[in-house]
Design a protein with these regions (language model features):
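Regulatory and interdomain segments flanking nucleotide-handling catalytic cores
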Residues: 1-349
């Protein structure tokens, strides 16, 4: 490409927001009327994306929060409102009586900051041969991204929450704001075990998800609200809360698959005894792992990037990722299908 005026910065055109806001509001109202209202979840998710479209680049407040978008402010406010409402259903007397503000009683911690972090990403992505390297790399990278987003979504749904409660999700890591209720705590405990078991059965320890949480409350008043973490006597700020949870989640790497191992220890067939089929077995041509009998998939010549082979045996999950890598070249959209008839929540890998 030749260097010309087109690659250098140009003069910024200033826009009068006072002129644009009324037009944005009219467009927002027009699209709001089209939102589906037959299903509550469909309405919430549609409203979420509509607000994201129209309010992401509007400041939450031109004086107090000019750097924060109105969309993030609305989303975070909605998440906290949901946490307080759900917690109050279980603990009706959580709030004190005040003429100006509603203080949270000292013995209550209604909000849970929850973190999930996928471990083993680099090893997992690059543990491949050159037989189908390009499609495998692309497919595996995208698969890890989908896995993190799917786990976050499953935790939200198991907890009776929505995308509004998701603070952040990127790079194989996510943070959620959840109500600290018995229902949510039981749902998370149950889901953690199901997920751990599913990941072990699918990847034999190559990928794991570290999860932890911190329950907290607020002390309102003064210039800023202060955060009180359950089990601590001193108040803190958001940055410290975030770091403490990050450190707790990282520490979970030392306890990977602990529940699976304990189940194995107490079961009839312990995990660390001799296993497998023995004899001549097939090995995945891409990852090099052993493949159990009747679980072999084949990739065709179109997906084989080096060598003269017409067909190669691979593990089932490797075949999925190669297919995913190929589909990324030819598809523009990702569509999520939700089955509302399913009761409870099973971890899907």
């Amino acid at each position: 490409m030749a260097i010309g005026d087109s690659v250098f910065p140009t003069e910024v055109v200033k826009v009068d927001n006072k002129v644009i806001y009324p037009d944005l509001w009219k467009e927002f109202e027009r699209e709001f009327e089209k939102l589906p209202d037959a299903n509550a979840n469909a309405f919430i998710y549609s409203l979420y994306h509509l607000l994201k479209k129209y309010t992401s680049f509007i400041p939450a407040s031109t004086q107090d929060f000019p750097e924060s978008s109105l969309f993030e402010h609305l989303k975070t406010t909605g998440a906290f409102a949901h946490c307080f409402a759900a917690y109050k259903e279980e603990f009706p007397n959580v709030f004190g009586n005040d003429n100006r503000i509603r203080n949270i009683k000292s013995s209550h911690f209604p909000v849970k900051l929850f973190c999930g972090d996928i471990s083993g990403i680099q090893t997992f992505i690059y543990n491949i041969t050159n037989k189908a390297a390009a499609k495998s790399l692309k497919g595996r990278s995208f698969y890890v991204q989908l896995l993190a987003e799917s786990i976050a979504q499953e935790v939200l749904e198991a907890s009776g929450c929505t995308l509004i409660n998701q603070v952040y999700a990127a790079g194989g890591k996510f943070y959620l704001l959840l109500p600290n209720t018995t229902l949510v705590n039981n749902a998370i405990t149950d889901y953690k075990y199901k997920l751990e078991k599913a990941l072990w059965e699918e990847f034999n320890g190559q990928l794991s998800v570290n999860m932890d949480e911190i329950n907290f409350s607020f002390i309102l008043g003064g210039e800023r609200s202060r955060i009180l973490i359950n089990g601590e006597s001193d108040t803190t700020d958001v940055g410290t809360l975030w770091k403490k949870l990050s450190d707790k989640t990282s520490a979970q790497k030392r306890r990977r698959f602990a529940d699976v191992f304990m189940d194995s220890y107490n079961s009839i067939k312990p995990l660390f005894e001799a296993g497998g089929t023995g004899g001549e077995i097939q090995v995945c041509a891409v990852s090099g792992i052993e493949i159990e009998k009747n679980k072999t998939k084949n990739i065709k010549k179109d997906d084989i990037e080096q060598g003269e082979e017409v067909e190669l045996p691979v593990a089932a999950y490797v075949k999925k990722q190669i297919d995913l890598g190929r589909d990324l070249y030819t598809h523009k959209y990702l569509v999520e299908l939700v089955n509302d008839s399913v009761k409870g929540y099973e971890a899907g890998v």
